[in-house]
Amino acid sequence: MGQKVHPLGFRLGVTQKHRSQWFAKPQEYSQLVLEDHFLREELNKRFPNSGIIDLFIQRKVDRTQVEVEIRTTRPGLLVGRKRQNCDKLKQLRDELQVELNKFRAKNGVSPTAKVALQVTTVQNKSSEAIVIAEFLVNQLERRIAFRRALRRVLSIIQRDRVQGAKIQVSGRLNGAEIARSEWIRTGRVPLQTLRADVDYCHREAKTIYGILGIKVWTFKGEIKPVRKAVEVPVA
């Protein structure tokens, strides 16, 4: 029986990069992984509907600074309008610093690392798999028929000219007694092409009939490798 590899892990180092980028000694590694997980959970808990796409975390070699880059489609919910950007960003940074210090003290680690925040705006949100998945979760939890929700998502994807998308919904669809899976696709979604910029997301919708699983793949285009010219010495 064939197995399906995770689309993002399959492309690490080609079109995808690691969400956490740092080096650590073996005895420090587990603590830093826990800190990264804590920061992600804290930000997603504080801003559940702010359109956060990705969180990239980098650390300096001497562990004095933690740099967190937040990619979001709705930066106004995170840092406010233009005049309030600096103040709200500083306030959010200070609050994260306090929570991180508490977490480190709880685990018996001295709170030395300072938090630095950067917010990046994502322009074409319809090509992001997490945006489509969360929209579908919202529709299905409001008891909208899954076919109508899928058609609505499909019209948005086609309107914004996304190159390709595939959506799969599994579970007791529309309250049926027997669970099943249904999917739709538009455009191209080349899952076996490494240079293809494919995004993927999995979410769960909690309905009165049970949990529905939602998987979304989006294709943003092919990233062609840059070929460097090689100088050949002339004899």
From Swiss-Prot:
Signal peptide: none annotated. Belongs to the universal ribosomal protein uS3 family. Keywords: Chloroplast, Plastid, Ribonucleoprotein, Ribosomal protein, RNA-binding, rRNA-binding. The keyword Ribonucleoprotein applies. Residues 39-123 form the KH type-2 domain. This is Small ribosomal subunit protein uS3c. GO terms for molecular function: rRNA binding; structural constituent of ribosome. It is found in: Plastid, Chloroplast. Part of the 30S ribosomal subunit. The keyword Acetylation does not apply. InterPro entries: KH_dom-like_a/b (IPR015946), KH_dom_type_2 (IPR004044), KH_sf_prok-type (IPR009019), Ribosomal_S3_C_sf (IPR036419), Ribosomal_uS3_bac-typ (IPR005704), Ribosomal_uS3_C (IPR001351), Ribosomal_uS3_CS (IPR018280). PANTHER family: 30S/40S RIBOSOMAL PROTEIN S3, SMALL RIBOSOMAL SUBUNIT PROTEIN US3C. One of its GO terms (biological process) is translation.
